[in-house]
């Protein structure tokens, strides 16, 4: 929501992640046999309603569909997480997620903080690799 509106061929575009934060439905529609979904939040994460919705309603009042997407984003996100959990339990997909909450500002330029987060990701990837290899070998 912090990004600027993009205009292309006289159409206005905003961050597509608002309407479809985890585009897994598109992925499954492609019909691939093995699917890997990479999440940015640890297991058990639940997205909460946006606390600044009153302000966003005013700022984007001329874009009612965008406001509706913002208002329901947490519901859609959480429903997608539920679907992914069901598919993961059934062995239909492999989900990669961080082992802990990784909170980093959008424009972080602190080398030590970026290194810390990188190391978490690297450790998690190495820990996940055997299970991922087994999933892909099935």
Residue ranges and their predicted role:
Residues 3, 8-138:
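Patatin-like phospholipase
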């Amino acid at each position: 929501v912090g990004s600027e509106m993009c205009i292309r061929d006289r159409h206005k575009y905003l961050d597509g992640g608002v309407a479809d934060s985890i585009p897994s439905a598109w992925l499954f529609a492609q019909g691939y046999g093995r699917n890997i979904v990479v999440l940015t939040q640890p297991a058990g994460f639940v997205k909460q309603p946006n606390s600044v919705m009153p302000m966003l309603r005013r700022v984007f009042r001329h874009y009612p569909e965008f406001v509706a997407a913002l208002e329901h984003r947490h519901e859609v996100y959480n429903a997608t997480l539920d679907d992914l959990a069901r598919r993961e339990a059934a062995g239909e997909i492999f989900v990669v997620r961080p082992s802990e909450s990784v909170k980093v500002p959008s424009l972080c330029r602190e080398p030590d903080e970026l290194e810390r987060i990188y190391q978490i990701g690297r450790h998690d990837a190495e820990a996940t690799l055997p299970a991922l290899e087994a999933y892909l070998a099935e």
